[in-house]
Amino acid sequence: MITKHLSDIDIAQQAKLRPIQDIAAKLQLHDEELECYGFTKAKISLTIFDRLKEQKEGHVILVTSINPTPAGEGKSTVTVGLGQAFEKIGKKAIIAMREPSLGPTMGIKGGAAGGGYSQVLPMEEINLHFTGDFHAITSAHNALSAFIDNHIHHGNELDIDARRIVWKRVLDLNDRALRQVVVGLGGQVNGYPREDGFDITVASEMMAILCLAEDLTDLKKRLSSIVVAYNRDGEPVTVGALGYEGVLTLLLKDALKPNLVQTIEGTPALVHGGPFANIAHGCNSLIATKMAAKLADYVVTEAGFGADLGAEKFLNIKTRAGDFKPGAVVIVATVRALKMHGGMKKTELKEENTQAVLKGIHNLEKHIETVQAFGLPYIVAVNRFITDTKEEIQAIEDWCLAHDHPVKAVNVWEEGGEGGTALAEELTTLIEKKKNSFSYLYEEDDSIEEKLSKVAKVVYGADGVTLTSKARKQLAAIEENSWGHLPVCMAKTQYSLSDDPALIGRPKGFTITIRELKPSVGAGFIVALTGSILTMPGLPKKPAALEMDLLEDGSVTGLF
């Protein structure tokens, strides 16, 4: 199969999609459990959990990766391809993925629905507005901002300190000009002037809450617990105190339902939720994962960026919230990323260099050690690119086998599910025969500083953590408000194991600087901001949006 001259969108547009009712039938869904959005998309009613409450749950397989290049290493492609591969070997499988954000889609990535012959479809719709979940989250989030300012304008009964409002507005785009703004200008009629700012929607606590809530009741409880500000006595002010948890639940009731779509080969996929992994917890919704586990024998899901970010949060935050144990972990490695970690310039990554691959393989080694620290069975998946040579692929496989790490090369971009069957077969054996000793990296009763230190030392390979004076002050407030039992969510660069994106490979002798600690009480974790990580990204010099267009025949171009 020669596909190197076809783009992802070309391949997607040539695919013949099946009616979404046919995909639902593969899962034995009832008609009343399906809410169709056109011909190829649907939401699944949460009432399905009542019907399947006695159903045994399938195995959840987490796909993670090494520290990526800016273009990504095809983790979503491997996730989709592996789900298709399970069906190829006769297993009932579902893929559970995050929804793409318009910010990176318009910015650098151009889309995030997999690639080649391992995509979720309809790719154009999934990458753009999809079923409107992100718009609902954005609306609910910004409605809360409006309610806060309105409360202050009409007498401020809760005595909110306008200097200590911690609830920013959001937008699902990269817009650096909105990072810091002033609202309420123009006189008394326009409210109380104050500093504000915008985060990207996928970094918002509202997104995290939607992705960690177990049902509508839990959603409302979490929304009620959101801390939006502090009063003049320094006490937290919550959504529950303002009284708006009901309307926020109403705004999010449909967004809470998972979205059913299909892969290019007709494998069912639940694409739902989408928090960033570098500035949020980076996993698809808990509801979608739990639903998938009730509907299939194997659930293939992913967590954003490398094992130092998405996987760590999946294993420390998501599994804890959902009380489930993953069956195995797939660690995606690529020749080009290992060459980058081996010191090659990004402009040279297409050139053959086996020595650079072996020099950079220590980055893979650290991510393997991280997964081992959680006690889970794992396998390395070498994701093939057209520019890879046999010698480079062989070098990775030889190193893995020499160090007793299971490894399989995959070519799911070009071959679809067929290119991942060896990986799927190996995973079924791993899950059945390999001991699963899953445990969390830290306990709830560890102090926040102990949790931060364990993540830094065990996952990043750091010597420890250093808290700025601002973070120390925030830590004292967290402990005073009895939030110290919550897990930590590290906001860190995805390009390095450290908090410095320039430190590639496997750096040593470094510490992680915690510059700020933000309690996300509704989501159920403490966000620890490190380095220079931003919660509202900016666009590159030439955004991917420049290449996007709608042609006269209605076809879309420029998504990839």
From Swiss-Prot:
Pfam families: FTHFS. Gene3D superfamilies: Domain 2, N(10)-formyltetrahydrofolate synthetase, Formyltetrahydrofolate synthetase, domain 3, P-loop containing nucleotide triphosphate hydrolases. It catalyses: (6S)-5,6,7,8-tetrahydrofolate + formate + ATP = (6R)-10-formyltetrahydrofolate + ADP + phosphate. GO terms for molecular function: ATP binding; formate-tetrahydrofolate ligase activity. ATP binds at residues 69-76. Keywords: ATP-binding, Ligase, Nucleotide-binding, One-carbon metabolism. The keyword Transferase does not apply. Pathway: One-carbon metabolism; tetrahydrofolate interconversion. Its EC number is 6.3.4.3. InterPro entries: Formate_THF_ligase, Formate_THF_ligase_CS, P-loop_NTPase. One of its GO terms (biological process) is tetrahydrofolate interconversion. Belongs to the formate--tetrahydrofolate ligase family. This is Formate--tetrahydrofolate ligase. It comes from Bacillus pumilus (strain SAFR-032). The lineage of its organism: Bacteria, Bacillati, Bacillota, Bacilli, Bacillales.
